[in-house]
Amino acid sequence: MFTLKKSLLLLFFLGTISLSLCEEERDADEDEGEMTEEEVKRSVLGTVKDLLIGAGKSAAQSVLTALSCKLSNSC
């Protein structure tokens, strides 16, 4: 059982190294100045996500403020 685990771990490790080398080679082939379509999508989605998180935080803060006001009867 232990030898099976060792061999599977070795195959996983070698596959990971092979995959990372392929990715590095592919990245080296692409132009450095150009943004790929995936990078553009990631940046747009990241911006939208940040905006939604900010809006959610402000909405939650206003709800919590209103609740604390109602609970303490200090409105």
Curated annotation (Swiss-Prot):
This is Lividin-3. Residues 23-40 form a propeptide. The keyword rRNA-binding does not apply. GO terms for biological process: defense response to Gram-negative bacterium; defense response to Gram-positive bacterium. It is found in: Secreted. Keywords: Amphibian defense peptide, Antimicrobial, Cleavage on pair of basic residues, Disulfide bond, Secreted, Signal. Antimicrobial peptide. It holds the Pfam family FSAP_sig_propep.
